[in-house]
């Protein structure tokens, strides 16, 4: 469960 955006998400 990731309540934060991943480090590889597009801008």
From Swiss-Prot:
It is found in: Secreted. This peptide evokes slight hypotension (-2 mmHg), when injected alone into rats. It has a bradykinin-potentiating effect (75%), when 60 nmol of BPP-11f are coinjected with 0.5 ug of bradykinin into rats. It inhibits angiotensin converting enzyme (ACE) activity with a K(i)app of 82.10 uM. The lineage of its organism: Eukaryota, Metazoa, Chordata, Craniata, Vertebrata. One of its GO terms (molecular function) is toxin activity. This is Bradykinin-potentiating peptide 11f. The modification Pyrrolidone carboxylic acid is found at residue 1. Its main location: secreted. GO terms for cellular component: extracellular region. Belongs to the bradykinin-potentiating peptide family. Keywords: Hypotensive agent, Metalloenzyme inhibitor, Metalloprotease inhibitor, Protease inhibitor, Pyrrolidone carboxylic acid, Secreted, Toxin. Expressed by the venom gland. GO terms for biological process: regulation of blood pressure. The keyword Coiled coil does not apply.
